[in-house]
Amino acid sequence: GVRFYDEMVQAIARYANSQNKVTAADLFSNEPFHIWMEKMSKKHLAAPKHYTIPTGWYYERSRKRYQQEQLKLRGDELKRFLAKFPKKQLINKEQLAIYYTAVIKCEPHIVSKGKNWAMKEFGTAISEEFRTKKETFNEFYFERCICAAIIFRTIDDYLERNKDSARNQTGFWYKVGGYKLNIVPYTIAKILSAIPKGCTLNWKKIWDQQMLSSAFMHEIEIVTRMTNDFICDSHGMIVTEYCKRQSTWETYCTTVPYEPSHSFIEELVPESMMKEIENDAKKDQKEINDLQTAIDMITKGAAYWNALLTKGSSLISFQEQAAITQIINMATTGNIPSSRSGKLPSKTVSIVKAA
């Protein structure tokens, strides 16, 4: 069908002539996951901490989409859009791939291979997961993605803001032209891997505050310098190449001593607490998904389902006939069916189409 054709075209495009200036991110832009992220970014807003109104993290699933939306607006409408989606809260697909890989997966060696590599790995895995585990993709998942962005950008900004250069002689240990692209993900992974077993970051607090605590910043100040010292001792290898090796991360993780401060540990929460929040979010999302499925079925109308029932009567089980009959009743009355009965007709459609 159409979906198979779309997937085939995208698959061919991924292996097309590499001379064409098409990135991995461009090829993944129409994947359902990125469409979902775009929709979620427009409706799930952050609390007004830095701003006077709730604001969104605009997810740009295709290039220049943020700019194109602004071109349609004028005057007060444009001001409202920029107030709701400030430029500093713009996030694109490559950035999400980097942030997710660095923070959620703790794989600094993958991040060090560059945005295209990270995008291919992230894009392929996440597209498959989105197809098979849809309830995983919920408000809490979105919030964690944004928290990952906040963590990554906070460290990046810290190095950029304090860097020592000929124009701005700060005396800071990080110099202009340093290995920031490697220091940031390695710092994140080092801090997070040192969290005691059974504990985790308070993702909800980071989302609510839209910033990191002073205790977290203290760890960043210590570990960024430690990370720089470690990667610069690259045993004769080019530092950027050294950072791409999984063995480099494993060595840093297991052999370089580091214990988070007491104040940082105190801010952590039990892993079970975050797991409970995650499970609740999955349940809520499953209900939303089931409701949407039911609505989609009702929208097809009673005539569609009556025709299907007539055409496939010899192929449809008694249970499936009962489900379709219920959908017909619901389509007629406008009432929403239960999620249990709402699932069966989609199976029936595939049986009849295959006949």
Tell me what each language-model feature is.
Residues 167-173, 177-181, 185-355:
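Charged, low-complexity intrinsically disordered segments and flexible loops
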Residues 19-23, 43-48, 110, 133, ...:
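Short secondary-structure junctions and interdomain/linker hinges
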Residues 5-157:
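C-terminal catalytic or substrate-handling cores of phosphate/nucleotide-
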